Amino acid sequence: TRETNGPTPAPKFYTVPAAGGVEEAMPMPRAFQGRISPDGKRVAYRMNNSWDEERRNYRGGKNRPIWIVDLKTLDLESPPWKDSKDMEPAWLGDVVYFISDRDGVANVWSYDTKSKKLAQVTDYSDYDVKTLDAGAGAVVFEQAGYIHELDAKSGKEHIVKITASGDFPWMMPQWKDVSARIASMALSPTGKRAAVEARGEIFTIPADKGDVRNLTNSSGSAERDPAWSPDGKQLSYFSDKSGEYKLYIEAQDGLTPAREIALPNHKHYYTPAWSPDGKKILYTDTDLKLWVLDVATAQAKIVGEDPWMVPARTMNPVWSPDSKWIAYVKHLNSLYKVIVAYNLETGRAQQITDGLADAAWPAFDASGKYLWFLASTDFGLKSQWLDMTNYDHDENFGLYFAILNKSDASPFLPESDEETGAPAPAAGAGGRGGRGGAGGEAADAAAAPPTNRITPNVSIDSDGLQSRIIAVPGIAERQYTRLAAGVAGTVFFAEAIPATGTGGGGGRGGAGGGQTVHRFQLRDRRATPFLTGVADYEVSADGRKLLYRTGGGGGPAAGAGAGPAMFIVDADRLVPAAGAGRLNATLRTYVDPKAEFKQIFAEAWRNQRDYLYVPNMHGSDWPRMRTMYGALLPSVMHRADLNYLIDMMGSEIAVGHSYVRGGDIPAVTPTNGGQLGADFVIDQGRYKITKIYDNESWNTDLRAPLAVPGVDVRVGDYVIAVNGEELRTPDNLFRMLDGTAGKQTVLTVNTTPTAVGARHVTVIPVANDQGLRARAWIEHNRRVVDSLSKGTLAYVYIPNTGQPGYTSFNRYYFAQQDRKGAIIDERFNGGGSAADYIIDVLQRDFDGYFNNVAGDRMPFTSPAAGIWGPKVMIINEMAGSGGDLMPWMFHYRKIGTLVGKRTWGGLVHTADTPTFIDGGSAIAPRGGFFRRDDKWDVENVGQAPDIDVENWPKDVAAGHDPQLERAVAEALKQLAAKPVERATREPPSPTWGKRLKPLP
């Protein structure tokens, strides 16, 4: 199970009586896999779990030898070892059998603890040996989908014949409700129907009358990204039914066969959109190239691209009303985004914005006069999305538009209401008075809905264009996104609803409430909230209807209970009432798991091919791997087994972060648990409290059930009963606490192990007390450092390089900046961002002083915030990703000394690998790290310490932390060799006012 007395849960061995009873911790601090020797005196074990068990050829810090520990003395021995991945140890007599990949393929090896002889037992060269166990003179293991039995004496092995008979009802084709699996959506040109992608099928849903249609009905292929033709008669979508994604065009009623169009390259495709004249379709691909396809000839060509891959795909191409222009977004080398307009007639692209503001989400006005977009002038620190430096700096956008033709005036020219006398009759005047001024006329013209649907001719005059970019007045800059055009003079844009809560202890906030969609209309010159609680939205081609979707919970606009919901509302009228326009969007499809498994397996293979950060697949023969592992696919009879197979195939690329997760696996309802935030020992058949955890100071997100003032429970008390049920061993306290989290629970406690004189105390258990234990571990370390250094060193723990790590660093580092040096502990660091901010602060030196007129006049340093003495960073094998990079930067910049063990070795980042149709995923890393000398580094290696220190089980069991203690000793040694030179007083006051010549 998990050891919780640390910053993160870690695997640990316990023993429990076979007949049931109280668990007892074994003395090894951490242990993941292993077996007790036949005589019960030793344990052979693997200490570390892995973030990716299927990763092949891994040689990072998590690889450790098999440890064989004497349970009495805690002395260790190990088989000969050098960086290999050794696992699954099991005993036969005095011989330990285990799996090792030391010869390039995971095979069975043995180590004789008496003769100290190491031997290779199997010699497979294709599939790795997987799980292993031993007993009754034989070793059994998994390989190539079979269970093998090997006779230890003869060395002969055979495949064990196993017949597993079952109906496997989950593998039978069946109808499923896939409404919760909506991945993309599109609104028909006049808003009569919505098209959605759900679980790889294309459905259309009526706004009011009619039935839902499934146009595709195929579990064996994935259909994605529907888009309506401008006349509403056809839908296009991408499908991999041929084995690679192609474009299909189908009648919207689904009654005729779809037209298949092969695309020039084998990639994944995004953002399809028909031109308003119906002659072309634009789309983007995996490599951020923008394509335009001629519908008649089926020929496609590249018309633009974004040269920088960032996690969020931001090209967002849109058509002009006359089908002659495409506006899209691209990154400059500054990493700022600009709006670009491509002319299909000339084949030339024109940059609309100058790159001094970050621009996004272009949208042509229906009048053809304006190009709307969002832009930010405080993008700065957000330009590098991976860096921690951009934390706590929100990018705020304003609403802008460019007047495309230099002959057009601004719609924001001054207006004035004036009496003009009796109005002369005018055709089409409709009795409406003029608004006065050229600006009012322009605004009214832009806002007026077209009556004859004449397509405007869009021309973009480059001369003076920058001076014709207008910031829309009266709209405060905020975190806007997702701009879309409506009828002429109308645009919509979304704003994230602020998150609430702490996000689980140190994060940037809890779950948000969706988005508010604002509507801006030129005729009113103002923006108003139009919808709230929105997850996504689309505006119809005529601008008069709006399709939106809410997430789980629905939000205020849903007017319904929990669960996703879709709505079609009028976009050009009053703000819709809550719940108006809700669609009857129950989507059901016939799912054939076998066919779906084949599609998902193929998609997993393609995703690695198309999205991996280097083109050579790390040297893997990738087509052969598809054949090799695909041979096992017919034997897969459960979605979890499919993940296992995909993970094994992906392991051939030998890269970190290639996680395989999720899918349509039956959900298991978790129990709510119940924990008291305390440690216990068994004494005279009772649970005796040996430690009560509190939430230390300033941790408002932690609750300690037994440390609440007024709760009369103390260390040394015995728990006699829980909710009136007497507790005695072998019964288990945690059985009685199961389901009590967040509920009033009555404990009967006493200072003696009897019920006589006991008292009743009402407490509220927590679901998980790991946070309390982690905080206790951190505070214990801080106090140890304070004690060992006699108050001269700070201790700062950094749990990850995400927001919690950023918060923890800022909290602890600057609160201790009166210390002369610092111990930075990043053990068990879970990664996140590139911790450039932390490294910059640690590297900081001061330049001088400003005097202080208070107290004893100790001067301020400039900069004032920092610790100016030695820094020592503690690392271990459980720190990775951003937790690999941070110590690498610390070492590279020569900030200080690294103490501990080599880190994980997983320095690639993930971004935009598409999910599977059933919600699962297999990640293809999108970027890797290499040094300035043009060599890849850290991935599959880790960062080695300057001083290698192991936390041996014997030392840890004795209450020591050798890595922490060695780090303190090193920092004190460096401090003694080079004391911090800091002024404690100011120099003599200057005499600049003294006259050079005395007054007469």
Predicted regions and their residues:
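Conserved blade-ending motifs and adjacent loop-strand segments that build the rim/top face
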Residues: A119-D133, Q350-W361, P473-A476, Y480-T481, ...
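Cleft-lining beta-strand/loop regions that shape enzyme active-site pockets
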Residues: E696-L706, I720, E725-G920, V956-Q963, ...
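Short coil/turn segments that connect the beta-strands within blades of beta-propeller domains
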Residues: D39-K41, G93-D94, A136-G137, T190-K192, ...
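PDZ/PDZ-like domain segments forming the peptide/carboxylate-binding groove
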Residues: T671-T729, Q803, G880, G927-G928
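A flexible loop/linker signature enriched in serine peptidases of the S9 family
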Residues: T1-Y14, A18, V22-G34, K41-W67, ...
